[in-house]
Amino acid sequence: MKPYFFALFAALFLLSCNSTSTQSDVTAVLQWDTVSGVSAGTLLRLDSSHTKGTISARPLDVWLPSTYDGKRKHAVLYMYDGQMLFDANSTWNHQEWRVDEIMDSLIAIKTTLPTIIVALHHGGVMRNFEYFPQKPFQTLRAQFSDSTMAAIASRYGSDTAFPVKSDAYLHYMVDVVKPLVDATFQVYSDKSATAVAGSSMGGLMSMYAIGEYPEVFGTALCMSTHWPGGFSPNEEIPNAFQKYLSENITPDRVGKIYFDYGTETLDAMYEPFQNQVNSVLEANGFISGERWVTQKFPGAAHDEKSWAKRLHIPLTFAFAKQR
């Protein structure tokens, strides 16, 4: 991997965080490596030192489209499960979202704004605990929440459940990653050009991100949203999410929000819950087809190949060219 430096912007970012930062700190923290394996654009990787203890150490990836020249400003999409987005040769299931090809193509035909992708890595076995919306979780009965988290931990090979840390993850996104991205790259920093996206638990986190930080994220793209929360049928978790939606995802607070679901594999669970969510959004005053969209994709499964096939739809919803 080849190093890629942003010395001036790195210095500005670090000095804003810590007035005692040295030039060696700047070099160590903001040396980006160019990562191979993408089919379009350029993928850069920052080492794990940037996390500053906000979450467990992990790298950060930023994808730059072919249009990126360091002069013209771009919109920004923050995406969860960053390990799964670009290269099927490096993913656990040998599938990928094909985000690089799809986004680059949409930009090339002038369907969407020029946009960079910030690929946020999950924490491996901690993924579900990082992506479970914390405020709804805290409303669950203790016995139920404990058993649910224990079952999730067991499913992923852990004897012990981790604490739910989605608030800390959002703090990492908003207070560490976004200032770094805004200082380093030529991007619009306003919420109208800033979106968040994910699938499954990442869909839940996208909803939670715009609910907690509507002043930061103007659009949330929630694909195959995992409304059951765990892996057993239940009503308590979906009800907690719907209460959160009723109180926080309202037209006067948030910009635009997109939901979708398939009908196969894990997605087969979602339609009844998504219909309930649709009713909550309508009661809140959203009008379908305007700032809120829900789409059903018959035959689509709960995997990266299915999400890649329809990714152009939410990307266009978020970044339709208008600037």
Where does each model-flagged region fall?
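Sec-dependent N-terminal signal peptides
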Residues: 6-9
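C-terminal motif of bacterial Sec signal peptides marking the signal peptidase cleavage site
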Residues: 14-16
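Non-catalytic cap/lid and distal C-terminal segments of serine-dependent acyl enzymes
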Residues: 21-323
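Positively charged n-region of N-terminal signal peptides that target proteins for export
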Residues: 1-4
